[in-house]
Amino acid sequence: MGIRIGIDIGSSTTKIVAFEQEKMLAPMVVRADSQVASLYGAFGRYLYENNLELSDVDGVYITGVGSKYVDKPVYGRPTYKVDEFEATGTGGYYLTDKKEVIVVSMGTGSFFVKVTETEMKHLGGVGLG
């Protein structure tokens, strides 16, 4: 089916979203005491609530402080770690129709990323979770 799953494993919440080609499916936020439990629970729940099968998933893209605990493919699917600044910048840019944006992440760590059609630049701050 060509589904790509993006998961941000933060210090207090796990955010998950899927894309089918360029179409974004409904995002979800999950809380759990364990970041690994939150990752696997969020992924399973997301598949269930969106009527998706594991075989539909072409790739899992993870970021956030909790991604350091993941050292093997998630549920056997191809899994890739994405830099938090890149993930936030790309996501923020996707959500707007502007040609140049400054994306601000306001979580446990706060940072600024400038994104244009051809460039992404971390302006300052830290990504802590």
Task: For every predicted segment, state its role.
Residues Y93, E117-G129:
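Glycine-rich phosphate-binding loop plus the immediately following alpha-helix
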Residues I3-G41, R45:
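Short glycine-rich, Thr/Ser-proximal phosphate-binding strand/loop in the N-terminal lobe
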